[in-house]
């Protein structure tokens, strides 16, 4: 994602380049912000009988956001507070910005918002991590998962209706191939990985071209085995999986070396003790003022920040800890 921060004007100009970038824009935009950009809306000039769709530059004060990860869409709604000259009657009316890859918007933040942490968040979006379509297969089922820097999304599980009938097994593999073709067209992954028992992975290579990842299990269980394996360590680091694994280990072996929950993390941050923090995206959206001030404090003391999606395995663990947890320096 391309971005430019103007500290004097308190603005962040962003150009999302991938659907994943929309997630980071969603994290940054809060109620009360002013969002500017080019858009298209219905406009009826004075004296005209009918309105028409007109491209115009305007700004809205944000009242609500709607982010759909499955559709890869972000909508920002609010009343129009600025509009280009020559367009009468639009100011004060409500408008919806559809934020899409390739279209620039400018976000004006409130005076109390800590701009210093914004760049750290946007750097996460700039990390060019591979998008992986994982096919985890055994002789009973094939599980499809989409793995990006944002987390692991389980898409579908296809069951083998021909269990025990060797003559029909190739029909099962053919149905898996068709599903792979459909998902590849829709998701456009950078890599396709086939995981499962070694003999089956070799056999299905006749139907599907992709990286082979032989392992003990396939299907749904194989998805979790793949995530925990040493493959794609860089991806796991970006997702916060390795940080979470260290957090869990430290919590079990040296409880005083971790901070769990908002109160403990706030106390540690005030002393500059946070080495790294894992925070849920939902925690930020539920208490934005409090969360951003805390993250800024951690950032200023050289702490690393991992924002974790709630709908991931790591996210479920952090949710159980109160939405935020950290490993401490001393």
Swiss-Prot record:
Subcellular location: Cytoplasm
E.C. no: 3.1.-.-
One GO BP: ribosome disassembly
Cofactor requirement: a divalent metal cation
GO terms for MF: endonuclease activity; metal ion binding
Matching Gene3D superfamilies: 3.30.1330.30, eRF1 domain 2, Pelota, domain A
GO cellular component terms, A-Z: cytoplasm
Enzyme class: hydrolase
Family: Belongs to the eukaryotic release factor 1 family. Pelota subfamily.
Quaternary structure and interacting proteins, as annotated: Monomer.
Alphabetized PANTHER family for the sequence: PELOTA, PROTEIN PELOTA HOMOLOG
UniProt remark on domains: The N-terminal domain has the RNA-binding Sm fold. It harbors the endoribonuclease activity.
Record's function text: May function in recognizing stalled ribosomes, interact with stem-loop structures in stalled mRNA molecules, and effect endonucleolytic cleavage of the mRNA. May play a role in the release non-functional ribosomes and degradation of damaged mRNAs. Has endoribonuclease activity.
Protein name: Protein pelota homolog
């Amino acid at each position: 994602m391309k971005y430019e921060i103007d500290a004097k004007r308190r603005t962040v100009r962003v150009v999302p380049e991938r659907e994943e970038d929309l997630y980071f824009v969603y994290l940054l935009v809060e109620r009360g912000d002013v969002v500017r950009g080019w858009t298209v809306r219905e406009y009826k000039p004075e004296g005209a009988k009918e309105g028409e769709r007109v491209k115009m530059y305007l700004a809205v004060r944000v009242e609500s956001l709607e982010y759909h990860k499955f559709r890869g869409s972000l909508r920002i709604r609010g009343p129009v507070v600025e509009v280009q000259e020559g367009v009468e009657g639009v100011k004060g009316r409500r408008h919806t910005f559809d934020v899409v890859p390739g279209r620039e918007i400018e976000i004006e933040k409130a005076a109390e918002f800590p701009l210093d942490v914004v760049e750290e968040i946007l750097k996460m979006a700039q990390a060019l991590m591979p998008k992986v379509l994982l096919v985890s297969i055994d002789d009973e089922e094939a599980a499809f998962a989409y793995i990006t820097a944002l987390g692991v999304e389980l898409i579908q599980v296809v069951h083998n209706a021909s269990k025990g009938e060797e003559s029909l097994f190739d029909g099962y593999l053919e149905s898996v191939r068709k599903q792979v073709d459909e998902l590849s067209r829709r998701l456009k992954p950078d890599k396709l990985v086939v995981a499962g028992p070694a003999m089956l992975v070799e056999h299905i290579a006749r139907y599907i071209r992709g990286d082979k990842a032989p392992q003990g299990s396939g299907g749904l269980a194989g998805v979790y085995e793949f995530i925990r394996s040493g493959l794609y360590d860089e991806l796991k680091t970006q997702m916060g999986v390795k940080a979470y694994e260290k957090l869990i280990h430290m919590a079990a072996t040296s409880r005083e070396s971790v901070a769990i929950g908002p109160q403990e993390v706030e106390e540690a941050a005030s002393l500059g003790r946070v080495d790294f923090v894992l925070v849920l995206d939902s925690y930020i959206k539920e208490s934005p003022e409090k969360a951003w001030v805390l993250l800024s404090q951690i950032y200023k003391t050289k702490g690393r920040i991992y924002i974790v999606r709630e709908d991931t395995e790591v996210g479920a663990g952090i949710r159980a800890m109160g939405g935020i947890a950290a490993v401490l320096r001393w």
